[in-house]
Amino acid sequence: MSLPTTSSPLTNDQEFAKPVRNGKIFENPKSFTNWGGRPGLTNIFKLVLRETSHENLPSDKKVLDSTLPVHNITADDFHSESGLFATWLGHATVLVDLEGVKFVTDPVWADRASFTSFAGPKRYRPPPMKLEDLPDLDFAVVSHDHYDHLDADAVKRITNLNPQIKWFVPLGLKKWMKNQGIGADGSNTVTELNWGESSEFVKNGKTITIWCLPAQHSGQRGLSDHNHRLWSGWAVIGENRRFYFPGDTGFCDVEFKKIGEKLGPFDLAAIPIGAYEPRWFMKSHHINPDEAVEVHKLVRARNSIGIHWGTYPMGTTEYYLEPRDKLKELMDAREDLKDTSFVTVDMGEIWEASDR
């Protein structure tokens, strides 16, 4: 039997930051000194009209198969003797087994990361695993409501395939989930948390603690719901293993340091490394590889894998393989991080934690 218990706020001396709430609107706190605000129409036009894209995404599938291989897998392939293993399913979707508890982050299988099926960012690398081939899932975490992180069809299908699943979401998303028919019957299928709150998930007598954590970002799905739903990162803490997922985020270094001090070290972090150029436009919302390496260090990750790249064209201007190449270059140069690992993996490749 598995169930989430009631949430509890952080009680340590130095608490995590809280979002600012103005009526229906959530905002990043003033302590996020790298937050530059929401890009206005002038900046959006400047991005479209003046910036040159260096993405150079190949149109030839054979080239993509070579540069970004996808290993098709099923639930039967997702196994290991390790107490922690994971596979990247594309973009920000990671399937994790932590001490026998299986969960997924930001499940997105959509062909387009958009409100419509005929426009918007079109997926150029397929998921390595069909929704129907997922193992039985215990829970899922959602970082925010942007279409490349929250796929309504996938959420509904996963719930139908896994009636026992629990969803952990930041403030404001529980109502959206209910509108999709998830938890609409009054069940405890959906647990909604604020930054610095946690919930315990119990399976076969084993307790997993799930933390909702600060992230520097925003939210929106329609024309009139900007920041009506909060954004967050997540930590999943087992008896012996720890996992961290920042979601989408700019570089809020003070909070990353707190996360590392309070909840680290992490055996695995899945850290975004893509969709970051031009910096004048993207810096507030997305870390780049340089900042991702600093996040890896600040949260005290023993191992990290790079995500949020190589899946959808996100309207940014960096070369499509630059996130991977830049990350390797940066890590090769960091003598202070030689005892840790921060790498990229192929979609469908099984990553396993080593014995400690």
UniProtKB/Swiss-Prot annotation:
Tissue specificity note: Expressed in interneurons that are in close proximity to the primary sensory neurons. Predominantly expressed in the pharynx but can also be found in cell bodies of the dorsal and ventral nerve cords.
Knockout-associated phenotype: No strong phenotype in the nape-1 deletion mutant, however its overexpression alters growth and lifespan when grown at 25 degrees Celsius compared to 15 degrees Celsius.
SUPFAM superfamilies: Metallo-hydrolase/oxidoreductase
The EC number(s) this enzyme carries: 3.1.4.54
Cofactor binding remark: Binds 2 zinc divalent cations per subunit.
Biological processes, Gene Ontology terms: N-acylethanolamine metabolic process; N-acylphosphatidylethanolamine metabolic process; phospholipid catabolic process
Binding site for Zn(2+) 2: 148-149, 248, 308
InterPro entries: Metallo-B-lactamas, NAPE-PLD, RibonucZ/Hydroxyglut_hydro
One Gene Ontology MF term: zinc ion binding
Cofactor section: Zn(2+)
UniProt-listed Pfam families: Lactamase_B_2
Keywords: Hydrolase, Lipid degradation, Lipid metabolism, Metal-binding, Phospholipid degradation, Phospholipid metabolism, Zinc
Keyword Iron-sulfur: no
GO CC terms: cytoplasm; neuron projection; neuronal cell body
Catalysed reactions, semicolon-separated: an N-acyl-1,2-diacyl-sn-glycero-3-phosphoethanolamine + H2O = an N-acylethanolamine + a 1,2-diacyl-sn-glycero-3-phosphate + H(+); 1,2-dihexadecanoyl-sn-glycero-3-phospho-(N-hexadecanoyl)-ethanolamine + H2O = 1,2-dihexadecanoyl-sn-glycero-3-phosphate + N-hexadecanoylethanolamine + H(+); N-(5Z,8Z,11Z,14Z-eicosatetraenoyl)-1,2-di-(9Z-octadecenoyl)-sn-glycero-3-phosphoethanolamine + H2O = N-(5Z,8Z,11Z,14Z-eicosatetraenoyl)-ethanolamine + 1,2-di-(9Z-octadecenoyl)-sn-glycero-3-phosphate + H(+)
Residues annotated for Zn(2+) 1 binding in this entry: 144, 146, 217, 248
Binding-site residues for an N-acyl-1,2-diacyl-sn-glycero-3-phosphoethanolamine, renumbered to this chain: 147, 286
Family: Belongs to the NAPE-PLD family.
Function: D-type phospholipase that hydrolyzes N-acyl-phosphatidylethanolamines (NAPEs) to produce bioactive N-acylethanolamines/fatty acid ethanolamides (NAEs/FAEs) and phosphatidic acid. NAEs are bioactive lipids that are involved in diverse physiological processes such as growth and lifespan.
PANTHER family: N-ACYL-PHOSPHATIDYLETHANOLAMINE-HYDROLYZING PHOSPHOLIPASE D
Name the UniProt record assigns to this protein: N-acyl-phosphatidylethanolamine-hydrolyzing phospholipase D 1
Species in which this protein is naturally found: Caenorhabditis elegans
The encoding gene: nape-1
